[in-house]
Curated annotation (Swiss-Prot):
Functional note: Peptide chain release factor 1 directs the termination of translation in response to the peptide chain termination codons UAG and UAA.
Name of the featured protein: Peptide chain release factor 1
Localization per Swiss-Prot or TrEMBL: Cytoplasm
Family that this chain belongs to: Belongs to the prokaryotic/mitochondrial release factor family.
Keywords assigned by UniProt, alphabetized: Cytoplasm, Methylation, Protein biosynthesis
Length: 360
């Protein structure tokens, strides 16, 4: 194992022991803010510490077996040789695991997200496909036990959505969905196509991490124009009775956010402000991310909204992710919420990029 990696693990072991002591300290236990913070850090550090402890045990076993290779008993030497082989294999596996565990964490991975889906080229068919994508992500969220709430929707004339915005809340939401941003293309025969010709349409997806209070950008109220209007669409008898829907325009950037799903104007405003903060944060970070991706020629992770990232081909039952040249013939499963079939290989490729960068 590299000396730099060993040094990091020794520091982490010291921190683990320190955290163990802190979590048993009566003064810390009585301060719930500190206790929760230390508990979260402990939960992150403990698996790495356990893997490092196992690595050290196997390293000791290897040294013991190597010493037996000099024994005069041939049977003992043969047994020791097998133990050396097994220990070396275990060490390689554990070292790879520890390297992955020590990769820099994206601080946004644990955040909730705003999911934006917009119809692009293709007219009605693009709007219908936006609806298909929204159902795909809704089913994926349901499988993972996440909570999804619609903030704003603009339905297409023949089904689907010209635009739909949702908030997704749960464990590691951004960590799973962050590589879904980009242009999604569909190739299929529309129901209105009498000649049976395959049409190509596209939608854009944006996944924005929801900032917490500390990370939220400070927004000058003078930079905002706030309009109220009557909600339209789903909502039962309450719709159109009160001006509960909110539209906020950030004048310096021209960004517009709307929220109409809550019955309370106050709740709609709070959701809209959180979404606006996420969009302003995204503007700041996107340029830096694109520069890094360009410099390192990353296949995954640029998050460029205009980049065509995936094609859904209905006649062939095929889904292709163009960033990693991944082709799967399981279109129905993926659209039914089995998005992990694409997400997991993307995350693996991203980790490989990070490991390569660590080796530079």
């Amino acid at each position: 194992m590299k000396a730099s990696l060993l040094n990091k693990l020794e520091i982490l072991q010291d921190r683990f022991e320190e955290l163990t002591a802190l979590l048993g300290d009566a003064e810390v236990i009585s301060d719930q803010t500190r206790f929760r913070a230390y508990s979260r850090e402990y939960a992150e550090v403990e698996p790495v510490y356990a893997a490092y402890k196992e690595w050290r045990k196997v390293q000791d076993d290897l040294e013991g077996a190597q010493a037996l290779l000099k024994d005069s008993d041939p049977d003992l030497r043969e047994m020791a040789l097998e133990e050396v082989r097994e220990a070396k294999e275990q060490l390689l596996t554990l070292e790879a695991q520890l390297q992955r565990m020590l990769l820099p964490k994206d601080p946004n991975d644990g955040r909730n997200v705003f999911l934006e889906i917009r119809a692009g080229t293709g007219g009605d068919e693009a709007a219908i496909f936006s609806g298909d994508l929204f159902r795909m992500y809704s089913r994926y969220a349901e499988k993972r036990g996440w909570r999804l709430e619609i903030l704003s929707e603009n339905e297409g004339e023949h089904g689907g959505y010209k635009e739909i915005i949702a908030r997704v809340e749960g464990e590691n939401v951004y960590g799973k969905l962050k590589f879904e941003s980009g242009a999604h293309r569909v190739q299929r025969v529309p129901e209105t196509e009498s000649q049976g010709r395959v049409h190509t349409s596209a939608c854009t997806v944006a996944v924005l991490p929801e900032p917490d209070e500390q990370a939220a950008i400070e927004i000058n109220p003078a930079d905002l124009r706030v309009d109220t209007y009557r909600a339209s669409g789903a909502g039962g008898q309450h719709v159109n009775k009160t001006d509960s829907a909110i539209r906020i325009t950030h004048l310096p950037t021209g960004i517009v956010v709307e929220c109409q799903e809550e019955r309370s104007q106050h709740k709609n405003r709070a959701r809209a402000m959180s979404w606006l903060s996420a969009k302003l944060n995204d503007m700041q970070t996107s340029a830096a991310q694109n520069a890094i991706a360009s410099e390192r020629k990353l296949l995954v992770g640029s998050g460029d909204r205009s980049e065509r990232i995936r094609t859904y081909n209905y006649p062939q039952g095929r889904v292709t992710d163009h960033r990693i040249n991944l082709t799967l013939y399981s279109l129905d499963d993926i659209l039914s919420g089995g998005v992990d079939a694409v997400i997991e290989p993307l995350l693996a490729e991203y980790q490989a990029d990070q490991l390569a960068a660590l080796g530079d």
